[in-house]
Amino acid sequence: MQKSLIFILVLFLSACGSDDSPPEDIIPEEKMAVLIADVHVIEARLSKISLMSLDSATIIVERLKMDNFKKNKVDSAQYNRSYKFYSTHPDYLERIYKNVIKNLEKRFKKKDYRGL
């Protein structure tokens, strides 16, 4: 009985192990870093507008994100799948955010806060 339990446990644990490489439909790290940087710029720009209601700001942020995704030939579902994948793989996410920071630093030096 104990051998069967150990065998089942080993089988289960080996089945849980997954390939950590991104699936084909996931946005590549470099492009994801640009998209995330754009999203941060969009959100930061709108957080400065205090005259707007929260609902209005949310609608505008979502619209600007959709425009940005369209410009980069990405849809929101693919972005969300990619973000979910990367957020569950800390090594990838750390590399992406290092690139996000570099991207934002370059924009700051150029005073290019548009993001779009």
Task: Kindly label every feature range from the protein language model.
Residues 39-43:
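N-terminal alpha-helical signal peptides/signal-anchor transmembrane segments
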Residues 51-116:
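Compact alpha-helical subdomains of small soluble proteins
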Residues 36:
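Conserved active-site segments centered on acidic
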Residues 33:
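Hydrophobic/aromatic beta-strand elements that line small-molecule binding cavities or substrate pockets
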Residues 27, 48-53:
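A ubiquitous short alpha-helical element
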Residues 17-30:
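Bacterial Sec signal peptide processing site at the extreme N-terminus
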Residues 12-15:
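C-terminal motif of bacterial Sec signal peptides marking the signal peptidase cleavage site
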Residues 2-8:
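Sec-dependent signal peptide recognition
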